[in-house]
Amino acid sequence: MKKLCVWAVAALLMAACTPKAEKATDSGLLQSNFQMEVNGKKTDLYTLRNKNNMEVCITNFGGRIVSVMVPDKDGQMRDVVLGFDSIQDYVSKPSDFGASIGRYANRINQGKFTLDGTEYQLPQNNYGHCLHGGPQGFQYRVFDAVQPNPQELELTYVAEDGEEGFPGNITCKVLMKLTDDNAIDIRYEAETDKPTIVNMTNHSYFNLDGDAARNEAHLLTIDADYYTPV
């Protein structure tokens, strides 16, 4: 009987010491792969989910949408955006995948602009032009994150006066909400202490047939009177 008790205690101790397997998101992501430190600030992975079990995963590194699991026409869940599986991949393979772009999205010709009579010279990181806020734009910064409920995430980044050549201290907020009609609502707010320019956007790469499929045969229709050639 004593030997049986010893074995029972040993089994209980082994069970107590065995770490519980980490549960992956529906898109197969592990939160631990997104928990590290970049430039002295902690990164993480945040998951939004609505009543339809649609899932959106976001990291505060660059305010990036990492995955979007949405039902297709047959009800099968598909990840319809491109993204990496870890922060290390985002750091070691620079890209704009899913990022919150700022301070100024798109190109600024020759990296120059004039505001209130003052000419500003920005980094020329794209064939002589300034692209997406420069080589260290918001997409490579760590945002402060607050998740007030399962369907919303608030991201905040404070850019200092002169960062990437832009004037003014500026507090930028990215408010992401997953609605119950399977839409991702993204709103941008910016507050500055002096005249500046700001133009933020999200840079997700979509594949509406799922990330494992090729998208060369997709047809995109833009319901607009005008568009800006790039």
Each predicted region: which residue ranges?
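C-terminal motif of bacterial Sec signal peptides marking the signal peptidase cleavage site
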Residues: 14-16
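An exposed, glycine/acidic-rich loop-and-rim segment of catalytic or binding clefts
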Residues: 18-54, 60-230
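Sec-dependent signal peptide recognition
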Residues: 2-8
